[in-house]
């Protein structure tokens, strides 16, 4: 599957936020190929239902997750992820992202499967030490459209939201993870699944 075979030109819309940057490419993946990649990932990725401990109680994480890459473990929210080897589809997507981000070489990807609008991820920053000082996070959306919210950690009126459609690419960069939180909120009206792939570089 060749992601470069499409007629429409692809370019980023760059949003300079206070203390960070977010770039959005709405047509990163051709619409006629998004369903094929979605189905392949849904069926072949080794999805896990992780558990998280909060306030002394164990709860299921409200989405399924998977961790793939070059061999680096990753820890977030007390969950230790051991990588599965890259699949062809993941490498296809990674290489095209790297084409649009010269100089970036991602060695890992965290995948999230939101089964419907009840699944979510709460406010957080991707600021784990193994990601380095100012990590570049490249996020591809497939499937259902979901809202992506950001808010500044210390300035309440600094907010940003965008509807992420299937085939879109979001890049978070600069000092964004130091100063901003992001989330995928519950949206009860959404009754279809979404897969999110967040490519990142674990520092050796």
What are these regions (language model features)?
Residues 1-204:
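Non-heme Fe(II) oxygenase metal-center motifs and adjacent flexible, charged/small-residue loops
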């Amino acid at each position: 599957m060749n992601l470069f075979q499409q007629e429409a030109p692809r370019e980023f819309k760059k949003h300079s936020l206070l203390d960070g940057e977010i770039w959005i490419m709405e047509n990163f993946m051709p619409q006629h190929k998004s369903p094929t990649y979605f189905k392949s990932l849904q069926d072949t990725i080794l999805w896990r239902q992780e558990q998280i401990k909060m306030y002394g109680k164990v709860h299921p994480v409200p989405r399924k997750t998977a961790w793939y890459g070059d061999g680096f473990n990753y820890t977030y929210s007390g969950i230790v992820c051991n990588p599965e080897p890259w699949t062809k589809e993941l490498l296809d997507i990674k290489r095209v992202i790297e084409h649009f981000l010269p100089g970036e070489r991602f060695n890992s990807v965290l995948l999230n499967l939101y089964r419907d609008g009840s699944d979510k991820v709460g406010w957080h920053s991707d600021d784990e030490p193994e990601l380095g000082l100012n990590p570049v996070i490249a996020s591809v959306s497939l499937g259902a459209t979901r809202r992506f919210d950001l808010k500044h950690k210390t300035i309440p009126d600094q907010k940003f939201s965008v509807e992420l459609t299937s085939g879109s690419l979001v890049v978070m960069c600069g000092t964004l993870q130091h100063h901003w939180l992001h989330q995928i909120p519950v949206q009860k009206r959404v009754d279809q699944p979404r897969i999110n792939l967040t490519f990142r570089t674990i520092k050796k």
